[in-house]
């Protein structure tokens, strides 16, 4: 055939192919138009953390027997356990317990292997601060339970 006619045929096929691709993209775009928005207005809306969420560690001072299992299973030897041996009863007495959340990787090994269950993970994840030294929590600050997102009336909770 003539080169001009074949050029017009190729041009027509390319035009049809381009229109089909544009139509497919438009169909995909329209399929997303009727979905609900997924944006969360963070300070005023929060997602409820799942049951297995690994947030800040909660520590119960009275249950701890200063066995230091948490230190041994921690991949970075993070918890600092200070204890004193009571010679009359031949038991360890816990003096101080602290965790630096600036270094903690929230692996959960300390919680999993604690024999007395004095450690547990909370749903608190808002640990940001301007000074990294404020992330070093002692037994008093570790013992405070965080305010539950569900109980906070100023925040609208959103289920996953």
Curated annotation (Swiss-Prot):
Keywords: 4Fe-4S, Chloroplast, Iron, Iron-sulfur, Membrane, Metal-binding, NAD, NADP, Plastid, Plastoquinone, Quinone, Repeat, Thylakoid, Translocase. Gene3D superfamilies: 3.30.70.3270. Binds 2 [4Fe-4S] clusters per subunit. GO terms for cellular component: chloroplast thylakoid membrane. It catalyses: a plastoquinone + NADH + (n+1) H(+)(in) = a plastoquinol + NAD(+) + n H(+)(out); a plastoquinone + NADPH + (n+1) H(+)(in) = a plastoquinol + NADP(+) + n H(+)(out). [4Fe-4S] cluster 2 binds at residues 74, 104, 107, 110. Belongs to the complex I 23 kDa subunit family. This is NAD(P)H-quinone oxidoreductase subunit I, chloroplastic.
């Amino acid at each position: 055939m003539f080169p001009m006619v074949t050029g017009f045929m190729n041009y027509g096929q390319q035009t049809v192919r381009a229109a089909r691709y544009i139509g497919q993209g438009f169909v995909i775009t329209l399929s997303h138009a009727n979905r609900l928005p997924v944006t969360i207005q963070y300070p005023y809306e929060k997602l409820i953390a799942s049951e297995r969420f690994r947030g800040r560690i909660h520590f119960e001072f009275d249950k701890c027997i200063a066995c230091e299992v948490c230190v041994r299973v921690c991949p970075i030897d993070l918890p600092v356990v200070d204890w004193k041996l009571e010679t009359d009863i031949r038991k360890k007495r816990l003096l101080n317990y602290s965790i630096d959340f600036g270094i903690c990787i929230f692996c959960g090994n300390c919680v999993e292997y604690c024999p007395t269950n004095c450690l547990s993970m909370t749903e608190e994840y808002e640990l940001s601060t301007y000074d990294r030294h404020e992330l070093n929590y002692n037994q008093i600050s570790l013992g405070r339970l965080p305010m539950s997102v569900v109980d906070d009336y100023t925040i609208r909770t959103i289920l996953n």
